[in-house]
Structures are given as structure tokens and as C-alpha cells.
Amino acid sequence: MALNSSAFFVPCHNYNQICDLLLSSARTRSTIKGLQLHGYVVKSGLSLIPLVANNLINFYSKSQLPFDSRRAFEDSPQKSSTTWSSIISCFAQNELPWMSLEFLKKMMAGNLRPDDHVLPSATKSCAILSRCDIGRSVHCLSMKTGYDADVFVGSSLVDMYAKCGEIVYARKMFDEMPQRNVVTWSGMMYGYAQMGENEEALWLFKEALFENLAVNDYSFSSVISVCANSTLLELGRQIHGLSIKSSFDSSSFVGSSLVSLYSKCGVPEGAYQVFNEVPVKNLGIWNAMLKAYAQHSHTQKVIELFKRMKLSGMKPNFITFLNVLNACSHAGLVDEGRYYFDQMKESRIEPTDKHYASLVDMLGRAGRLQEALEVITNMPIDPTESVWGALLTSCTVHKNTELAAFAADKVFELGPVSSGMHISLSNAYAADGRFEDAAKARKLLRDRGEKKETGLSWVEERNKVHTFAAGERRHEKSKEIYEKLAELGEEMEKAGYIADTSYVLREVDGDEKNQTIRYHSERLAIAFGLITFPADRPIRVMKNLRVCGDCHNAIKFMSVCTRRVIIVRDNNRFHRFEDGKCSCNDYW
């Protein structure tokens, strides 16, 4: 960028005024106005003044134009510590962590000392990269420079360790800080929520309220996420009420978490109400609502919302398209799914392995297994476990054991794989009556020292989660639960229910198969709900694995015989059973 050096000597009030205008343009995202100001700065030679250069870097950073920030930085002949801090922060804020850390190295090579503005940007970059090793180096640097006791630097370190999964280090840092602010508390809560340590996160939130800490939207979002992950609907509603009293319910950040809470707890109408009440919607809340509709089989609403999102001017990202593809897959809309897959290229978004896995799943569910295989064969990137796994699952559904074995071999060629792949192959063999091959697949799993994930179902009652495993009798109400199932079983048989014992994936005699399938975990959880909840309350059951075909059929009969709404969330989607019908239309 050419500079007019003869115009450098200008009255001081001129460059102060320019700085104020650049700051205003950054705050209001007035890109055109900012570009015009930059042109004036160049013509008048004001870019030689460090304060002006700093404001130019900040303007481009806030406008999400980090490479223009870099040009402004490079055009500045006098780079102060603040100039370096501005560019390092710019890269961190614009998701360019490696560049942020690279410029930190350059700054230190110039014998400039990083301060309490630079160090938080560096730790943020480490958190984005999940590079705890580099983060520890930044931590050491903060100790050498004496900034480790600074509340902002300390908070950023807590956040970094938490996001890198080093929850013990995060808590140690949190406990040793001489002073904490709301960012510190929120970072620690987020860390516990991310690691699934929900009780710790909730306890910390209560402690923050007890200390009269002015919690922020990040705090609310973290604790609402805990309630969502634990499916604690009633507690989540209470915290939602608290967020309204604190005026944080209109935040897109909190709104996204609330949408996820109501969706994961089986209340999609609550999710949509929250979505509608957030005045300014960011991409996160659009994606959260799309996912909620997709999980609840509201495919048409997904497509309508996607169109509405684009009309609003919001640009979709890879998560947006993944939600739309999953919705099409679950509804069997293959042609529509292919259309949206192709639209990704028009939006200049390269499909990831997750998008290809969704496309393979879509074709596989529809029985178009050869087309699914062709998609994998022609992928421009290497197929991952999730891609081959999608084909393997479809082969199990359509009892194509030869192709299932081929897909499994391809997965095993990738190296160590999840236990789910072995189980899927075993299930494919068992579904086809090849119990000897199924046993071999499970033996291979045992020989590798891996364990099959235990199927669990759980239900919330008065902020307490009751968990059940198939056939267990450890619950305090086991006697009543099994009596209820026996009574309900008789009513279901009178209504025409016949157990499909082909879903018992091991070779046992007919009577034992009949008994085994009647006591799957979701049935125990439903029976608990029937004897515990009032008649007008829907029974909401969560399950960590896919619901089996016979249980899916049985729950339809249960909804008829009990005249109850039963909502089951498995590891894939929601099923709402009412009057003998399921929201998935038996396509899952």
C-alpha cells in the first residue's frame, strides 16, 4: 500500500477523530464506511501513526477480514506492543489460531514482552487447537512475566485447560487464583459440562449464585447445556426462568442452549418458542433449531426453516447442511437430500466425512446399497469409520451380510476401531440367523480387550434421574415395575402384539427369547413412568443405544393400551408414540 509521506504532518485532533470513527465503524460493522476511512488514512499519511494502525487492525478484525488486518499491520512502520496485541487478538478472534501463535513468536523475537492483552489471545488459540502442550508453554510464559495472577490471564488459562479436556489442571488453576471474575467461573462450568461432570457444573453454578456473582450469558449457557446433556427438564426450566429474570434469555448464546435443552428433553415446541423469542439470531441458534426439528422427524419444518434462514441473509455452514442432510435421511427423502448435498458446493462448502456418512446412510436406509457403495468409492477424501459404519448399519437392516462383512473389513483396515463396529457386524450376522459368525465377531471384540456398551435407559423424576438396564431388578420399585409390565403385556397381546424374537441377537430357545425381549431397558423405564407420573404427563425416556425393532413396535401398542404419549430418544433421534403411531413413520 503506497503512503503519501508528505501528508504525515497533520494536526493531532485529525488522527484522534479518525480513530474514533474507525472504532465506531468496527462497533457498527460499517465495512464501507471503514474502507473509506482507510482510504483517507492512506492519502493523508495517518497510517504511520501507531494508534491509527491499531484501530485499522481492530476495524478489519471486527469486520471478519483478518488478512486486511494483517496488511494494515505490515504497512505500519512503528509497531508498538498494542499493535502486536491487536494483530494477535485479531487472528485468535477470527479462528486463525496458528497465525496468532506465530505472531506471538515474532513479537517475542523482537524483544517485546507479551502482556495481559496478548496472553489471553494466545491461550484462546491453544484452546481452539486443543493443544494443551502449547498452552502449558503459554502458562509458563505468563508466570515468567508475572501475569499468571492477573484475573483475565488466569481466566483464559482456566478456559484453555477446560476446553482441552484437562479438567484437573483447570480446577487447580481456578482454586489457586487470588481473584476470580464471571469469565473464570463460566470457563470452569463449561469445562465440567464438556467433560460430562454435570453434578460438579451444577454445584459450581449454585456456588456462584450463593456468592452473588453477576453470572453472564456464558454461565447460563454452560449450566443449561448440563441440564440438556443430563435431560434434567424441570431443573432446566427453572434455570430458564432465572435467565429471564436476569434478562439473558434474549441472548443468542443462551437461546441456542435452551433450544438444545428443550429438544433433547423431547419438547420441540418449547425449543421453537425460545427460538422465536430471540430477537437477533446468530448462526448457532439457527443450527440448533434445525437440529431440533431433524431429531424430532419434522423434516418439512427443517426445509422451511433452512429457506427462511437463507432469506434472512444468514449464510449456512457445514453444520447447517449436516442437519438438513440428516433430516432428509431420516425421512427417506433421497432426491431432496442429494439436492442439498450438491448445494454445499454452490455455497463453497467442502463436504466432510460426516456429510458423506449422512449421504451413505440416506441411500442405505432406502435400500439403495449399491449406490451407497458407489458414493464411498468415488469420495474425494478417504472414507472414515463413520462412513463405512453407515453402510454397515444399512446392510444389517436389509440383511445383506456379504456387503456388511465387506464394509466391516474396510473399517478394520483403518486400524483400531470403536466397539460399535464389531457389534454392528455381529448384529448383521445374527439378524440373518448366522449366530456362529455373530459369536466370532463378538469374540474378536473380547480378544481385543474391548467391551460392548451396555444399553441403558433413563427417565427424570423431580430432578432425579432413574437409570435402567435390561433385565435388572436393582431399582427400589422393581417389583411394581415388573408387575406393571406383566399386566401391560397381557393387554398388548389382546390388542394383537406378537413379540418379534428375531431381535434377540443370540441363539436361545423360543421361550427365553420371549422373556429376554420383554425386559429391555426402555420398557422398564416406561413402566416406571406409568406407575409414577400423572396420567396427563408424557413419559419421556432417553436411551444410549438404538431402540430395537420389537421394542419400537411394542411401544406403539403401549401407547394404545395406556392412552399415554410416550417419547423415546435413542442415540439417533426422537420417537413420539401416540395412539399406536410413531412420529418416525416406522422409518428409522
Curated annotation (Swiss-Prot):
PPR repeats lie at residues 14-48, 49-79, 80-114, 115-149, 150-180, 181-215, 216-250, 251-281, 282-316, 317-351, 352-386. Signal peptide: none annotated. GO terms for molecular function: RNA binding; zinc ion binding. InterPro entries: DYW_dom, E_motif, Pentatricopeptide_rpt, PPR_At4g14850-like_plant, TPR-like_helical_dom_sf. GO terms for biological process: cytidine to uridine editing. Residues 387-462 are annotated as: Type E motif. Residues 463-493 are annotated as: Type E(+) motif. It holds the Pfam family E_motif. Keywords: Repeat. Residues 494-588 are annotated as: Type DYW motif. Belongs to the PPR family. PCMP-H subfamily. This is Putative pentatricopeptide repeat-containing protein At5g52630.
